[in-house]
């Protein structure tokens, strides 16, 4: 089994996944940008960590939401390359969140090649957060995301951890929990 870790963070829209990941950018620097085909991300040498996705200040929809809809094959190739080179180089850990890569296919690929840890964020403030950010995600889309998360939970069969993300204190605790995987 691989010694490098891949941390996947999922949850319904507006639970605070992107806000949680932004804590890494606020607390560590520098971050170098990288690109592998259609897969973009940020690398921090001190944490030995790659965060997948595109994060820009002030964007509501950042992270893997900013990647191409056709990024999945490049993600899978990237995971294979990471596994292949692990024997020769001290490789990096990988962290991602969001709908684009948080799917069964990506999770299955990750768990066959790396030490996978899955966190699911939940919040009782999802409805008010949708209003606060003025998003226009349809009820059909939101129900589809709920179904997707439920299917992933069923597949993982309790091999995930739920993180409540209702307050600033929760955000800090969740950040420290995820950070502890890398330090």
Regions found by a protein language model. Give the residues of each.
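Conserved phosphate-donor/acceptor-positioning beta-strand/loop module used by diverse small-molecule
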Residues: 97-98, 110-131
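Conserved nucleotide-sensing/catalytic segment adjacent to the nucleotide-binding pocket
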Residues: 40-100
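NTP-dependent small-molecule kinase module
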Residues: 153-183
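A conserved segment at the C-terminal end of the G1
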Residues: 18-31
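P-loop (Walker A) phosphate-binding loop of NTP-binding proteins
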Residues: 12
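ATP-binding Walker
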Residues: 15
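Switch I (effector-binding) loop of TRAFAC-class P-loop GTPase G-domains
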Residues: 29-45
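Hydrophobic anchor at the beta1->P-loop junction of P-loop NTPases
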Residues: 9
């Amino acid at each position: 089994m691989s010694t490098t870790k891949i941390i996947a963070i999922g949850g319904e829209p507006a639970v605070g996944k992107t806000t949680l990941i932004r804590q890494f950018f606020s607390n560590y620097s520098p971050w170098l940008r990288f690109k592998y085909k259609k897969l973009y991300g940020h690398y921090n040498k001190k944490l030995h960590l790659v965060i997948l996705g595109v994060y820009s200040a002030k964007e509501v929809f950042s992270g893997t939401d900013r990647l191409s809809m056709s990024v999945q094959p490049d993600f899978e190739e990237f995971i294979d390359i990471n596994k292949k080179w692990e024997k020769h180089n001290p490789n990096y850990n990988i962290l991602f969140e969001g709908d684009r890569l948080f799917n069964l296919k990506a999770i299955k690929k990750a768990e066959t090649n790396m030490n996978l840890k899955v966190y699911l964020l939940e919040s009782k403030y999802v409805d008010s957060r949708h209003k606060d950010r003025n998003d226009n995600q349809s009820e059909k889309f939101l129900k589809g995301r709920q179904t997707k998360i439920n299917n992933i939970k069923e597949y993982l069969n309790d091999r995930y951890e739920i993180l409540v993300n209702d307050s600033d204190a929760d955000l800090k605790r969740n950040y420290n929990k995820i950070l502890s995987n890398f330090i």
